[in-house]
Curated annotation (Swiss-Prot):
Function as written in the Swiss-Prot or TrEMBL entry: Positive regulator of the expression of the invasion-associated type III secretion system encoded within SPI-1 (pathogenicity island 1).
Species in which this protein is naturally found: Salmonella typhimurium (strain LT2 / SGSC1412 / ATCC 700720)
Keyword terms, alphabetized: Activator, DNA-binding, Transcription, Transcription regulation
Pfam family, one: HTH_18
Protein name: Transcriptional regulator sirC
PANTHER family for the chain: HTH-TYPE TRANSCRIPTIONAL REGULATOR GADX
HTH araC/xylS-type domain boundaries: 195-292
Superkingdom per UniProt: Bacteria
SUPFAM superfamilies: Homeodomain-like
InterPro entries tied to this protein: Homeodomain-like_sf (IPR009057), HTH_AraC (IPR018060), HTH_AraC-typ_CS (IPR018062), Tscrpt_reg_AraC-type_HTH (IPR020449)
Lineage, top ranks: Bacteria, Pseudomonadati, Pseudomonadota, Gammaproteobacteria, Enterobacterales
Length: 295
């Protein structure tokens, strides 16, 4: 059987960059990550502690472990993580747009009229949660360990692991038939100009991207690019900043280097400037973030 390609489609991130069981205390029992841009649909498994997620639309959810979250792409969120009995433990899988398209085709073919009607009558939801049923935690971990690349924050092919495609589909199926689930999937397969620009920039953050270069990649003029981004109420500089800050968060969480090295990998010439921008963006210094995530 030929499976849909999952090459560079799933990225694994854990609070423990060595991908071993980990429990760590937080500073003052609470860690906040503010203004984090969710670039791809995100599966988030909370093993220990509690988590509150809030987005720019005022939607929020708060749950204690163990549970699984599914977050929609193209939203900005604040994550508030609290320890329970001195610990918090989590892992995440970032699922690409291409892979969500393939899952959508499968789920769409199995839905019925009532599912569609329920979705239309439901207020849009940008994240869901599900209890961890028997086997779900092990399934998540098998995917996580199958694609994880210790200390290197990059997408990894899992084409050779046939079970991973169906395992991931199984986990996402836990959310599909929830109210608003199909509506969520339909939004997940649409891609904005903002997302296209983001994907180009983050593909090589060591490069100094100009609007003209990105416009050329998208086969449009600079004026057309500016017009499309203005219609989406976002600027080129904001997308550039989100890409750099997201990569910084991932690299720091994965332990991919010290602060100076991370600054360079994110396209910054000086560590001091990177630290200032990171603190202004996330309301926490890179060093405090590293201590929190990798203690």
């Amino acid at each position: 059987m030929v499976l849909p390609s999952m090459n560079k489609s799933v990225e694994a991130i854990s609070n423990n960059h060595l991908q071993q069981p980990n429990k760590f205390p937080l500073i003052n029992g609470l860690a906040d990550v503010r203004d984090y841009y969710v670039a791809n649909c995100l599966l988030f498994k909370l093993n220990k502690g509690s988590l509150r997620i809030e987005n720019e639309f005022g939607e929020f959810i708060e749950r204690s472990a163990p549970c699984l979250f599914l977050l929609e792409k193209d939203q900005t969120i604040t994550l508030s993580m609290s320890e329970i009995e001195g610990h918090i433990d989590f892992s995440s899988l970032e699922v690409s747009y291409d892979l969500m398209q393939k899952f959508y085709k499968v789920f769409y073919s199995t839905r019925n009229y009532n599912d569609r009607e329920l979705s239309l009558k439901t207020k849009p939801k940008y994240f869901f949660h599900a209890d961890l049923l028997p086997g779900m935690s092990d399934t998540f971990d098998s995917i996580l360990h199958g694609v994880a690349c210790p200390r290197v924050c990059s997408n990894v092919s899992i084409d050779d692991h046939d079970y991973s495609y169906f395992s991931l589909m199984y986990l996402i199926s836990a959310f599909v038939r929830k109210p608003g689930g199909f509506d969520f999937l339909e939004r997940a397969i649409k891609i904005t100009t903002k997302e296209k620009v983001y994907n180009i920039i983050i593909s090589d953050l060591t490069r100094k991207w100009s609007q003209a270069e990105v416009a050329g990649k998208l086969f449009m003029s600079v004026s057309s690019l500016k017009r499309k981004l203005a219609a989406e109420e976002v600027s080129f500089s904001k997308i550039y900043l989100d890409a750099r800050m997201n990569q910084a968060i991932k690299l720091l969480r994965m332990g991919a280097g010290n602060i100076s090295q991370v600054a360079t990998m994110c396209g910054y010439d000086t560590p001091s400037y990177f630290i200032a921008i990171f603190k202004r963006h996330f309301k926490i210094t890179p060093l405090s973030f590293m201590r929190t995530m990798n203690h």
